[in-house]
A protein has these predicted regions:
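Mature extracellular/luminal domains of secreted and GPI-anchored eukaryotic proteins, especially small
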Residues: 1-178
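Cleavable C-terminal sorting propeptides in eukaryotic secreted/cell-surface proteins
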Residues: 180-206
Length: 206
């Protein structure tokens, strides 16, 4: 997950956990406005219920609030550049005219909290899986107005699963391994992400 050497693990945990918990609390208030404990004929769906909606939201929330990251130097084509205008930890910046600096989606993180409170510098994100978003829409009442973007916005916001099992998009429980060719800097991203998953998995399935 996006991190910063100036922020210790305990503080990083608190930032992500508090942010996710506040989002989930707001969602819970909205879900409670629906008839969750009622007869089948009055439910919003016969196929899914509010428990399914809550679980789908937790899985989506964890995928989008704790991004899976790789070093900016990674060339995998499923990665989405982020924070191209920020400086790296060592104070250097991307070369002027870098094409990533011209795209709005490449110049900010998915969450403003990351840019404002963590300031991780440029990195590349393994986008959440499209099916995680689609499952959220299918599982929840229409009154919550969840929707997934379309076209180019979908491609910039969500990734697709690989048929060969490689992790090309982010979802809860995804296993990811670094090979020997990965950089030490990228290892920092991986260790931070693993810590984040440990923290959030325990929270998400309460």
């Amino acid at each position: 997950m996006p991190s910063n050497p100036s922020i210790d693990n305990a503080q990083l945990k608190s930032l992500y956990d508090d942010y996710a918990a506040s989002k989930f609390q707001n969602f819970s208030y909205s879900l409670q406005q629906n008839q969750c404990n009622t007869t089948a004929e009055n439910m919003y769906s016969l196929a899914v219920n509010c428990d399914n909606c809550s679980q789908a939201y937790k899985e989506w929330l964890c995928s989008v609030t704790i991004p899976r990251c790789e070093d900016y130097s990674s060339s995998d084509d499923f990665l989405q550049p982020r924070n191209a205008w920020q400086k790296f930890f060592n104070g250097t910046s991307l070369d002027a005219g870098n094409p990533d600096q011209k795209l709005a989606a490449s110049n900010r993180s998915r969450s403003s909290m990351i840019d404002e409170q963590i300031q991780p510098g440029p990195y590349k994100e393994v986008l959440p899986c499209q099916d995680v978003c689609h499952n959220l829409v299918r599982s929840c009442p229409a009154s919550l107005e969840f929707s997934c973007p379309q076209g180019t916005l979908l491609r910039l916001s969500y990734g697709q699963r690989s048929p060969n099992g490689e992790v090309t998009c982010n979802y809860m429980g995804a296993a990811y391994y670094l090979n020997a060719g990965r950089s030490i800097h990228e290892g920092l991203w991986f260790v931070s992400y693993a810590l984040g998953i440990f923290w959030v998995v325990s929270w998400a399935y309460v």
